[in-house]
Amino acid sequence: MAKILLEMKNITKTFPGVKALDNVNLQVEEGEIHALVGENGAGKSTLIKAILGEIPHTGTIEFKDTKDGHMAKLKIGYVPQSVNIEKNTPVSVYDLIASYQYNYPVFLPKSKKIEAKIRETLEVFEAEELIDKQVCNLSGGQLQRVLLSMAIMDEPNLLLLDEPVSGIDQNGMELFYKTMDYLKTHYDLAIILISHDLDYVAKYADHVVLLDKTVAKQGTVKEVFESKEFERIFYTGEESWVREEEHK
């Protein structure tokens, strides 16, 4: 039986004039990919920010451990939806990761030990050839692979991904989801993934949470994708009729 890593109770967040989250209750288990799906404005990114402690909210978020009910040291890896990189910043991928991860000054010569560790992590996402490239010259897909590598370097307990495959081509998406499947299995990692790629969610997610400011439906892919709540949010009018015809 999977172990609960994170439990959210009655999470509510209101911005001026807008309720972004309304009594969200959710449990996240180790070794599973939890996909957050829903329309734009459903509160998915807001929920990620609440978990990260970036925004105040009501309700409780509790990180748990198997021994005493609480984690001695929680490590969270996070990849945002987008990152702004100054075009004139002459920093290589090695410099970026070494300075961020190891506080290693960019003006010092390369450390062979640090370089080996960085290269090893980049290899997980088939990005080792990017180690000497200037960050400002990376494509969107290349940058996302570098950010994903940075997110897992500390071997986190929890990995938060806010639409991490935006800007990545089809081959890159397939590699990403296969890598997530590998990480959750080999590191017993809990992954919370925001995604609009429903085909990939159906293929790789262990647990799906349909968010509509509150949890409209959660469960297995089958339970959520075949629910009336999913139908209401994602299929209306002619699209709904087409879907009904497909299932006859």
Question: What is each residue range found by the language model?
Answer:
Residues S195-H196:
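H-loop/switch region of ABC-family ATPase nucleotide-binding domains
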Residues L159-E163:
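Catalytic Walker B motif of ABC-type/P-loop ATPase nucleotide-binding domains
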Residues K112-L130:
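Conserved ABC ATPase "signature" region
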Residues V209, K213-E223:
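Conserved switch/coupling elements of ABC/ABC-like ATPase nucleotide-binding domains
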Residues K222, E226-K228, R232-K248:
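ABC ATPase nucleotide-binding domains
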Residues Q134-L138:
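Conserved ABC ATPase signature
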Residues V37-E39:
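The feature captures the beta-strand-to-loop junction immediately N-terminal to the Walker
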